[in-house]
């Protein structure tokens, strides 16, 4: 049994610290990406090209789709033939830690498609569960095997200084680690991520099918500084959820004892929903969660990704698109803040942060 990463002197850096690169996966799952994923592939391409201006992008793509991916991306990425069940690199990729000598360690969590037999979104996730270890092997990085502890990368945020941010709705959901107490889950996080403190937000984004991942509702933009998804519409179920999160954060301090500066990031003014026109594009396998017309999608500008030279922010053709860009431009004065049309990623069930995973420098 290997010592825990914490005992070995490793910790999880913040996303805004320097990257060696970013991991992504080419979107091909017919039950996630409608109409052969054509629109999604264009969106992924724009994201990859933007990230690649400042760091290496590793793209997992199976041999059958390699020539297609190359037709979009040419030599802008490093292609790796690693099989997957879907394209959520944030959730299936490794969480890569560093120590003070600059050595890296990849944490491999158990993945069960956001809830396994209890409320998972698809039943065959065998390949996804191997992505983290296979990618670490390709990078020749040592692996810390955290299995059978179930976790996705989108369920944790780190400030790089000992603080981990999570939601209770996700980490305490019955489909993850039902046999562990909250205290046991917290201790596992602290040991596996080399952290000092876990902050438990009550909620994420309304109807987020990941059981409300933290990366859709709140994110660190600097030490003791956060953005929080927000709405002033008291009739929207999101209002009470964000309000509860805000009240908790206002009382909390980070691992160093500092109070937080909190920036409210509005959610889109118009609700993003699945339309009748979207539905014929999906092809499901048995046991896979199906979309329905009018289904509210968990749209949030908080699902941005911080790359070395840019911050990539979802856009929804909404009046709040520019508001979100303006707020984040103030948070990241040294980076280009880039809006990316993101509805076609949202139709898959996540957004820009969900399809990216940073590899620290």
UniProtKB/Swiss-Prot annotation:
Q: Which InterPro entries match?
A: Agmatine_deiminase, Peptidyl-Arg-deiminase_porph
Q: Keywords of this protein's UniProt record, alphabetized?
A: Hydrolase
Which residues are named in the active-site annotation?
354
Q: Does the keyword Hydrolase apply?
A: yes
> Source organism's superkingdom?
Bacteria
Molecular function as annotated in GO:
agmatine deiminase activity; protein-arginine deiminase activity
Q: Which Pfam families match?
A: PAD_porph
Reactions catalysed, as given in the entry: agmatine + H2O = N-carbamoylputrescine + NH4(+)
Which EC number applies?
Answer: 3.5.3.12
Q: Could you mention a single GO BP entry for this protein?
A: putrescine biosynthetic process
Cited PANTHER family: AGMATINE DEIMINASE-RELATED
Tell me which HAMAP family the record gives.
Answer: Agmatine_deimin (MF_01841)
Protein family: Belongs to the agmatine deiminase family.
Record's protein name: Putative agmatine deiminase
Gene name in the database record: aguA
